[in-house]
């Protein structure tokens, strides 16, 4: 028959009574009385009896809330009176529990002690002792830990409460203390290569706008090249590319350039593809070279020299016309008004060179009036009639015929440029109309408000001057050839 072992019952004293929150004065009275809460109506919250209970003639009772909520601790880390009372009760219960476990382990047999160690009693976080900010070190040395010991082969770290005990409210001081990280197996306790100081970040000098922009430009210089140069040698070595692109227009961009959506994007794209700079270089080259208009006295070697110079001039003009055609084929800057204006001046300059070649005299006895001043960029009908009325010899008529046979190239160039000028003229006219009526935005994406400083009348005048100069030059050459 099994006997009842009363040794363990007599040896283990009874547990300490559990102190409830209601006994500590931490409960909270409900805002609504029991009658209003049961009836699901709004309570007037009148103590000690609400008006609704009085009107109904029933007893008004206020009960304690089931969830009173947590009490906040003060800034120094000390708990409130309710928390301190519960902490004291918990610490006393834990100390009595530890003494009971020690006495039971000394009196009980090894089997019972092993069973107790293998099955520890479940504890909650509120039963654990909380160290105070004043005596954290003492709490670590006197208060026992009821947590199971950690495995030393993995991590030998003290509990968090013991680590943060002397640093209850200063977390950064914990990071600055090297002894906290000493138990880690792969961590250097010297802390010479790690700086956890929080003030070093605020002591760094603030970077101003100039330094920040300079830093960005330094980074950009490593990623983006300063200049973009085209491989002209490979382009000229290709027979197809060399035949399609003239020698003077080897660096003119092709239609593969990215399309522009707005005027600012178009302007930036034109600057990146160097269309405007190429147009200015062409205009500068045309202005620097002079046409052979000086008369010669004899029909011998001088006639051959004049004809060769006229042929060279027409060859250069042909190359200039091809360059301008390539400029107009660039899709990224086709709406750039400044580029169109520069191209119009180039066309007028080419017509002026053709007129100078048509005025070249061979074997004449009279002297020509000479080249027209460089300031007269735009010729008119009377200006063309005056020099073209002095053709005396066969050499002069040959030069005029050669010029007349080349004017169809200029006609194609004007026909290519004219739609672009009209498109920009219409867009600028609508933009000026919007601004005149007080509208600062345009009706659609294609209309740009004040996209250029050139007025629409300027573009219309340039188109009219090109067509007038071309028709006047061809008509005068035909009339003089018929008269002679």
UniProtKB/Swiss-Prot annotation:
Notoamides have been shown to exhibit antitumoral activities. Notoamides A-C show moderate cytotoxicity against HeLa and L1210 cells with IC(50) values in the range of 22-52 mg/ml, but the IC(50) value of notoamide D is greater than 100 mg/ml. Moreover, notoamide C induces G2/M-cell cycle arrest at a concentration of 6.3 mg/ml. Residues 76-122 have a biased composition (Low complexity). Residues 33-60 bind DNA. One of its GO terms (biological process) is aflatoxin biosynthetic process. It holds the Pfam family AflR. Residues 139-154, 368-378 have a biased composition (Polar residues). This is Notoamide biosynthesis transcriptional activator notL. It comes from Aspergillus sp. (strain MF297-2).
């Amino acid at each position: 028959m099994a006997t009842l072992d009363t040794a363990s019952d007599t040896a283990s004293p009874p547990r300490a009574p559990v102190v409830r929150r209601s006994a500590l004065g931490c409960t909270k009275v409900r805002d609504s009385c029991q009658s209003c809460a049961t009836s699901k109506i709004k309570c007037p919250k009148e103590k000690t009896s609400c008006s609704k209970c009085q009107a109904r003639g029933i007893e008004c009772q206020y009960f304690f809330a089931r969830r009173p909520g947590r009490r906040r601790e003060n800034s120094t880390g000390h708990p409130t009176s309710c928390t301190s009372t519960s902490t004291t009760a918990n610490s006393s219960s834990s100390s009595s529990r530890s003494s009971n476990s020690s006495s039971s382990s000394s009196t009980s047999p090894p089997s019972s002690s092993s069973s107790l160690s293998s099955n520890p009693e479940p504890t909650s976080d509120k039963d654990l002792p909380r160290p105070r900010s004043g005596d954290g070190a003492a709490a670590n040395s006197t208060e026992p830990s009821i947590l199971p010991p950690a495995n030393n082969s993995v991590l030998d770290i003290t509990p968090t409460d013991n680590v943060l005990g002397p640093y209850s409210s200063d977390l950064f001081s914990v990071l600055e203390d090297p002894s906290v990280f000493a138990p880690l197996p792969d961590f250097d306790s010297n802390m010479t290569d790690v700086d956890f100081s929080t003030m070093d970040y605020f002591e760094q000098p603030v970077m101003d706008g100039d330094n920040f922009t300079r830093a960005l430009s330094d980074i950009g210089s490593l990623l983006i090249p300063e200049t973009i140069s085209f491989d002209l040698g490979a382009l000229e070595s290709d027979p197809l590319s060399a035949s399609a692109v003239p020698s003077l227009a080897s660096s003119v961009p092709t239609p593969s350039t990215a399309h522009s959506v707005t005027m600012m994007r178009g302007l930036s794209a034109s600057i990146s593809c160097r269309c405007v700079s190429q147009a200015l270089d062409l205009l500068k080259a045309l202005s620097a070279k002079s046409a052979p208009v000086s008369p010669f006295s004899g029909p011998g070697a001088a006639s051959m020299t004049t004809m060769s110079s006229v042929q060279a001039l027409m060859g250069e003009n042909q190359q200039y016309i091809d360059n301008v055609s390539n400029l107009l084929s660039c899709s990224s800057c086709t709406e750039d008004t400044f580029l169109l204006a520069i191209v119009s001046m180039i066309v007028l300059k080419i017509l002026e060179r053709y007129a100078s070649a048509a005025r070249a005299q061979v074997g004449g006895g009279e002297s020509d009036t000479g080249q027209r001043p460089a300031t007269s960029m735009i010729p008119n009908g009377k200006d063309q009639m005056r020099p073209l009325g002095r053709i005396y010899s066969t050499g002069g008529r040959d030069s005029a015929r050669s010029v007349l046979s080349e004017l169809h190239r200029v006609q194609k160039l004007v026909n290519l440029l004219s739609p672009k000028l009209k498109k920009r003229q219409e867009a600028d006219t609508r933009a000026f109309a919007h601004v005149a009526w007080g509208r600062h935005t345009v009706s659609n994406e294609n209309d740009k408000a004040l996209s250029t400083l050139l007025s629409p009348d300027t573009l219309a005048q340039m188109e009219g001057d090109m067509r007038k100069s071309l028709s006047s030059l061809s008509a005068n050459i035909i009339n003089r050839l018929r008269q002679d």
